[in-house]
Swiss-Prot record:
Residues 4-186 form the tr-type G domain. GTP binds at D16, H17, G18, K19, S20, T21, N133, K134, I135, D136. This is Elongation factor 4. Belongs to the TRAFAC class translation factor GTPase superfamily. Classic translation factor GTPase family. LepA subfamily. It comes from Solibacter usitatus (strain Ellin6076). Its main location: membrane. It is found in: Cell inner membrane. It catalyses: GTP + H2O = GDP + phosphate + H(+).
Length: 604
């Protein structure tokens, strides 16, 4: 098809602002699916995506639309994940487009996520079409939202399209706006081939299937292609596009979006953001913006039943086939046995992987407290990266420790400011910006350590704001901080899986809170058990679990005190001997308690 009639666009929206429903309506109106095949959220094919109401993987669907001017246009809708964990995938999907629909809920207004993705879209010079959705709601205030889009996002919203995706109102106007406002793709079909990979997944019959947008040149069946990041060469075995069912074709050219498979074995080979070129006539430079995705959050995953270790490894291998951002390596813990140290993009990613393991592979898991990657310079000047408390070096060898810092923006209502500011303060945040964005809403920009966010920040932010605050963050760099490793000793033995890395100023309180929580969770033994929190050799907190004891003097009626004393001394001697050889079983809840330590102690 002539490039003049191709439009590539994506939909930007905050979670729950109606992005997937709008995509459904666009498919329905353009006749991509018959009534019989329509179901809610056609593009969210994973069960988890539907249940949580989020989009995890990107999709690309071709719609054929005959506009009011009588011409037939090819619209490529590239559906992007909306969550902050997947922001790199979003930026690559946006790079494949020339325009974006900015969908805002008519009752809720602009949220932090919408803002972050809009800035990404502006960064890629996309044409942004504001769409105000859910105008059928009784609480809808389209005029107020128009002003808000102009003040907060800074784009002209006078011509914003009003629609209700649920009732199918205004869909025609959106399609017309795409045709008239989004520019056709640039790039020449005669230049050397350059195609951008913006998603890939694994198919057990065809290997890796790559979703791509052809920027320059053309791609044909049987052509030899090369991936520019790692230099690997493959032969194109299949080409096609989703409409939304996969439809095969023999050639794709500049401006078009489609998929290819070429007997690629792992998703790790076809990295998101990489450039595909041809072997015969290669492009001189790759497309800009490619970076290796680095995990930001780390946690240990262990099977509850130790014999399921092999099953867990197979399950993780299968997940990695589809998720190149997820990585893992085996680790061994004295307390939990064999398991894996896994790296994730963020907390949502961690939850999704955990849930998929439990749901699709039926494995019961113990997850250790999530942590982040620290940079440590030792006394001899070497730089090491540590993401596991057990690998934390001896304090005497450490010169400096740097922790990852994020820039977070929070949008909330003024009524909840007090609680949110207190929470940000408690999490060692420094305020960078504070602005009113109209209609009683405030936007806060803070610099926070990533370490403080990974435990329970999001949940507490939601409770402090009764669910009204929205959060977006991105990594901004590293900063030197006095971090220490807090060890937990149970009956004098350190339990590696309970160790955490904390800021020196909070180590005492954290240690105290953790020990008092463990005391409630570890059952009484036949002997006295000491629980201690230690930093290096210094004990900062201690609790004692008293022993269960039998009343040995119950059978003595009256009589001499020395008889009773003899029995009590005998019992004491036995308990002492037991304490020397006894082992304490730590229940699974105890490991989960580490996660809850930073919550205020009043909810105990």
């Amino acid at each position: 098809m002539d490039r003049e009639f191709i439009r590539n666009f994506s939909i930007i929206a905050h979670i729950d602002h109606g992005k997937s429903t709008l995509a459904d309506r666009l498919l329905e109106v353009t006749g991509a699916l018959s009534q019989r095949e329509m179901m809610e959220q056609v593009l969210d094919s994973m069960d988890l995506e539907r249940e949580r109401g989020i989009t995890i993987k990107a999709h690309a669907v071709r719609l054929n639309y005959r506009a009011d001017d009588g011409k037939l246009y090819q619209l490529n809708l590239i559906d992007t994940p909306g969550h902050v964990d997947f922001s790199y995938e979003v930026s690559r999907s946006l790079q494949a487009c020339e325009g974006a629909l900015l969908v805002v809920d008519a009752s809720q207004g602009v949220e932090a996520q919408t803002l972050a993705n809009t800035y990404l879209a502006l960064h890629h010079n996309l044409e942004i079409i504001p769409v105000i959705n859910k105008i059928d709601l009784p609480a809808a205030e389209p005029e107020r939202i128009r002003e808000q889009i102009e003040t907060v996002v800074g784009i002209d919203a006078r011509d914003a399209v009003l629609c209700s995706a649920k009732q199918g109102v205004g869909i025609h106007d959106i399609l017309e706006a795409i045709v008239h406002l989004v520019p056709p793709p640039k790039g020449s079909p005669d230049a050397p081939l350059r195609a951008l990979i913006f998603d890939s997944w694994f198919d057990s019959y065809r290997g890796v299937i790559i979703l791509m947008r052809i920027i320059d040149g053309r791609m044909k069946l049987g052509q030899k292609i090369k991936l520019m990041a790692n230099g690997q060469v493959f032969e194109v075995e299949g080409l096609g596009y989703q409409a939304p069912k996969a439809t095969a074709c023999s050639e794709l050219q500049a401006g078009e979006v489609g998929f290819l498979y070429a007997n690629i074995k792992t998703v790790g080979d076809a990295k998101i953001g990489d450039t595909i070129t041809e072997v015969e006539n290669p492009a001189t430079e790759p497309l800009p913006g490619f970076e290796e995705i680095k995990p930001m959050v780390f946690a240990g995953l262990y099977p509850v039943e130790s014999h399921e270790h092999g099953l867990l490894r197979d399950a993780l291998e299968k997940l990695r086939l589809n998720d190149s951002a997820f990585n893992f390596e085996p680790e061994n813990s004295a307390a939990l046995g064999f398991g894996f140290r896994c790296g994730f993009l963020g907390l949502l990613h961690l939850e999704i992987v955990q849930e998929r393991l439990e749901r699709e592979f039926n494995i019961d898991l113990i997850t250790t407290a999530p942590g982040v990657r620290y940079r440590i310079t030792d006394t001899s000047g070497n730089l090491v990266e540590v993401d596991n408390p057990t690998k934390f070096p001896d304090p005497s060898y450490i010169e400096t420790i740097e922790e990852p810092i994020i820039d977070a923006s929070v949008i909330t209502r003024e009524d909840f400011l007090g609680g949110i500011l207190a929470l940000l303060e408690e999490k060692r945040g420094t305020q960078k910006k504070f602005e009113h964005i109209g209609a009683g809403r405030v936007m806060l920009t803070y610099e926070l350590p990533l370490n403080e966010i990974v435990l329970d920040f999001y949940d507490r932010l939601k409770s402090a704001s009764k669910g009204y605050a929205s959060l977006d963050y991105h990594l901004s760099g590293y900063r030197e901080s006095p971090m220490v490793k807090l060890d937990v000793l149970v009956a004098g033995e350190p339990v590696d899986a309970l160790s955490i890395i904390v800021h020196k100023d909070f180590a005492f309180e954290r240690g105290k809170a953790l020990i008092s929580r463990l005391r409630k969770l570890i059952p009484k033994q036949m002997f006295e058990v000491a629980l201690q929190a230690a930093i290096g050799n210094k004990i900062v907190a201690r609790e004692t679990i008293s022993a269960m004891r039998k009343n040995v003097i119950a059978k003595c009626y009256g009589g001499d005190i020395s008889r009773k004393r003899k029995l009590l001394e005998k019992q004491k001697e036995g308990k002492k001997r037991m304490k020397r050889v006894g082992r304490v079983e730590i229940p699974q809840e105890a490991f989960l308690s580490v996660l809850k330590v930073s919550q205020s102690s009043d909810d105990d």
